[in-house]
UniProtKB/Swiss-Prot annotation:
NADP(+) binds at S14, G15, Y16, A17, N315. GO terms for cellular component: cytoplasm. Disulfide bonds: none annotated. The gene is lysY. Its EC number is 1.2.1.103. Pfam families: Semialdhyde_dh, Semialdhyde_dhC_1. It comes from Deinococcus radiodurans (strain ATCC 13939 / DSM 20539 / JCM 16871 / CCUG 27074 / LMG 4051 / NBRC 15346 / NCIMB 9279 / VKM B-1422 / R1). It comes from the Bacteria. The active site is at C151. Keywords: Amino-acid biosynthesis, Cytoplasm, Lysine biosynthesis, NADP, Oxidoreductase. Catalyzes the NADPH-dependent reduction of [LysW]-aminoadipate 6-phosphate to yield [LysW]-aminoadipate 6-semialdehyde. This is [LysW]-L-2-aminoadipate 6-phosphate reductase.
Length: 348
């Protein structure tokens, strides 16, 4: 394997997702970020927008029209923007990683149903690998088009996948509720992100019809009815998802444990969290700030056969930029953990 670093250009680097990819890439042993674009922050030092990167880079933002070629193009644009300009970006780099939802879905009709308009480049759908190494590691090897998985979808998919893959859930509705940090809404200000409206608030913002439902339905084995509800929380980072599902008669904790161990036993970023005592018995997104881990827990109701699954991630890392880096590592044949070694903080 060559030790020469791959050059990276980040398009839309002033937002939270692009900034998080930049943070991780600056510490990556095989990546060299050479360009970061932003229309609103052009000519400003990157550290003016991302103050946590002071002293880590001397890069300045440039306009996308000034984008030069790079080995890897990372698109951190608003949804529906990358698809409209994809041929422009394909001319700039061999490998493209998209952090938006533009290329995650394979079916243009499903895209239109969930996003409310026809896909701008339907011929592209199906050409991109869904950026979830836990499910698509082999597909990602050598991939040049990676569509990063959605954050809420990631928390749902990773919790459910082992049980569905092994046929371990009864054929009943699956209900997932996600408590989501404010950074998932992006860096642009809105009425709902205004401090007097958001601070201290727990607000249901998508009780039905969440767009990430389509991703989860596409990626998970089987065709169970799946229902997602999203609730905004006062936290900045993190998603804590609880999922109500049902196991076959006679199943116990040990059976659920065995399913997770069988599927995730060798996964570098999946941790099963189920401790008998203490305040950290189950997954907690506070402990995952800045990390690429997905912590998964569960509890059985033996009287009803209901199993409550819990998953926690940092929405900007495992839910976006970290998952993208992990996918890129697999695609390039690097150590899957490269650039993703941060273990989190406690207390925070």
């Amino acid at each position: 394997m060559s030790t020469e670093k791959k050059t990276v250009a980040i398009v839309g680097g002033s937002g939270y997702a692009g900034g998080e990819f930049l943070r991780l890439a600056l510490g990556h042993p095989h990546l060299e970020v050479t360009q970061v674009t932003s229309e609103r922050s052009a000519k400003l030092p990157v550290s003016m927008v991302h103050p946590n990167l002071r002293g880590a880079t001397n890069l300045k933002f440039r306009k996308a029209a000034e984008l030069e070629e790079a080995d890897i193009i990372v698109l951190a644009l608003p949804h529906n923007s990358a698809a409209k300009r994809i041929t422009e970006f394909e001319a700039k780099g061999k490998v493209i990683v998209d952090l938006s939802a533009d290329f995650r879905l394979k079916d243009p009709e499903v895209y239109e149903r969930f996003y409310g308009e026809p896909h701008p480049a339907p011929e592209q759908l199906g050409q991109w690998v869904y950026g979830n190494p836990e499910l698509h590691r082999e597909d990602l090897r050598g991939a040049t088009r990676i569509a990063c998985a959605g954050c809420f979808a990631t928390s749902v998919i990773l919790a459910l996948y082992p049980l569905l893959r092994l046929g371990a859930l009864a054929p009943k509705d699956i209900i997932a509720t996600g408590l989501v940090g404010s950074s998932a809404a992006g860096a642009s200000a809105s009425e709902s992100s205004h401090h007097p409206e958001r601070a201290g608030s727990l607000r249901v913002y998508k009780p039905v019809g969440h767009r990430h439902t389509a991703e989860a339905q596409q990626e998970l084995p089987g065709k169970f009815p799946l229902h997602l509800t999203a609730i905004s929380t006062p936290r900045v980072r993190g998603i804590l998802t609880t999922i109500q599902a049902w196991v076959p008669d006679g199943w116990s904790d040990k059976d659920v444990w065995s399913a997770y161990r069988e599927v995730y036993g060798q996964e570098p970023f999946i941790r099963i969290v189920k401790v008998a005592k203490g305040i950290h018995r189950y997954p907690d997104p506070m402990l995952l700030d800045g990390t690429n881990f997905c912590d998964i827990g569960f509890e059985m109701d033996v009287d009803t056969g209901r199993v409550v699954l819990m998953s926690a991630i940092d929405n900007l890392v495992k839910g976006t930029a970290g998952h993208a880096i992990q996918s890129l590592n697999v695609a390039q044949g690097w150590d899957e953990r490269a650039g993703l070694g941060f273990l989190g903080l406690h207390p925070t």
